[in-house]
């Protein structure tokens, strides 16, 4: 990137002028990650100061039985397949209670698209979980799951959301987005929920007062132009509804092999190489610069590792996903050397060591607890890398 274009982009960002599709592609083409990270850091600081948000949550997957066979997914099993499972509602409640502690604020629930479970299983599950954990927010179901519920129930998404909200739903999850462009999506997704339905369902959720996250799965067969297109679609929807709280880039996990039966569950593996740390940081930085109307960008350390997650905080991210138990959708922690759980104290140390002030939040981004910032005498902030 020449000096003139750099200066032009800097001027636009600092003036608060919206970046275009062409600007986004130019940013991805830059090989100066230090400059790009610094520019994204200016924006995250303008929006969120020196704060890094986190929450204490748990993940619950009530069934891994799924009609789809998405190319990136290591989680799904077909009915009757070895390791396929479906929890009874009382089992799900018992497991959730076992994960409860005095700091838990959120239960994050996603499942496979089970062909035989009745629709009523899902609102009943939420209702019983809410009774058991009345002070815990229920963030549950992807737009893909809501679309599946339409199919199995014959109900509209609007009526489905009304019932789920009555049962205790406080937010949808952001999954099922992957990459929206059909050029890529047709090769990685094996279900019927594409941009039109994904956006329709989140638009409905926002109209009913729910705030939701949005995600992007990157680092597989997509190109930078597909990432830019993905963010711009979300940005346009955010202009309309204002309902997205946070954007979450998710790095595709390349090398998953099931340790129990030796099968390669990730069908994209032979066609891709996992995104490097530098590519991950570039994705966070460009996302922060393009997605000017979303307040937060989150790094999910389970998919990036804690060191890259710390660096992402200096490249546009201001939220680090909280303590996680039993996260199963994309990878097995034993294969990647990344922990499947961090305590609140672990997160506090990671945030401070990266040079930021931790702030604990709930699902609605209401502040629960503020903490002291880093000790300047022991601070050793990660330095941006060059591609």
Regions found by a protein language model. Give the residues of each.
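Auxiliary Fe-S-binding modules of radical SAM enzymes
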Residues: 1-34, 94, 100, 238-387
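Conserved Radical SAM active-site core
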Residues: 77-236
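Conserved short loop/turn motifs at secondary-structure junctions
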Residues: 24-28, 58-59, 111-115, 218-221, ...
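Conserved, mostly hydrophobic/aromatic
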Residues: 16, 40, 70, 109, ...
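Mobile, glycine- and charge-enriched loop segments
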Residues: 52, 56, 62, 66-67, ...
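N-terminal pre-triad scaffold of radical SAM enzymes
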Residues: 35-79, 84-110
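Short glycine/proline- and charge-enriched loop/turn segments
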Residues: 74-77, 182-186, 261-268
């Amino acid at each position: 990137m020449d000096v003139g274009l750099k200066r032009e982009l800097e001027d636009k960002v600092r003036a608060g002028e919206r970046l275009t599709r062409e600007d986004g592609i130019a940013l991805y083409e830059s090989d100066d990650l230090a400059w790009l990270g610094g520019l994204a850091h200016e924006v995250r600081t303008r929006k969120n100061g020196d704060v890094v948000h986190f929450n204490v949550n748990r993940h619950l997957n009530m069934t891994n039985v799924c009609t789809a066979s998405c190319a990136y997914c290591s989680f799904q099993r077909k009915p009757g397949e070895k390791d396929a499972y479906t929890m009874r509602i009382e089992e799900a409640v018992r497991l959730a209670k076992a994960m409860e502690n005095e700091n838990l604020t959120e239960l994050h629930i996603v499942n496979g698209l089970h062909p035989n479970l009745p629709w009523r299983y899902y609102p009943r599950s939420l209702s019983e979980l809410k009774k058991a954990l009345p002070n815990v927010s229920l963030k549950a179901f992807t737009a893909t799951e809501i679309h599946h519920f339409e199919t199995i129930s014959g109900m509209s998404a609007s009526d489905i959301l009304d019932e789920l909200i009555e049962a205790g739903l406080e937010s949808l999850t952001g999954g099922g987005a992957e990459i929206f462009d059909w050029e890529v999506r047709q090769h990685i997704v094996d279900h019927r929920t594409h941009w039109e339905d994904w956006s329709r369902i989140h638009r409905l959720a926002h109209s009913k007062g729910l705030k939701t996250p949005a995600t992007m799965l990157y680092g597989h067969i997509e190109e930078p132009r597909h990432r830019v297109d993905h963010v711009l679609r979300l940005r346009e929807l955010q202009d309309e509804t204002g309902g997205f709280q946070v954007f979450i880039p998710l790095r595709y996990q390349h090398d998953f092999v099931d340790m129990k039966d030796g099968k390669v569950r990730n069908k994209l593996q032979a066609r891709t190489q996992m995104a490097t740390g530098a590519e991950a940081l570039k994705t966070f930085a460009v996302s922060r610069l393009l997605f000017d109307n979303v307040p937060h960008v989150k790094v999910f350390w389970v998919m990036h590792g804690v060191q890259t997650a710390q660096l992402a905080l200096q490249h546009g991210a201001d939220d680090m996903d909280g303590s996680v138990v039993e996260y199963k959708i994309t990878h097995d922690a034993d294969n990647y050397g990344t922990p499947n759980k961090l305590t609140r104290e672990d997160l506090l140390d990671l945030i401070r060591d990266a040079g930021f002030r931790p702030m604990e939040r709930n699902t609605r981004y209401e502040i629960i607890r503020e903490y002291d910032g880093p000790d300047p005498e022991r601070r050793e902030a990660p330095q941006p890398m060059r591609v």
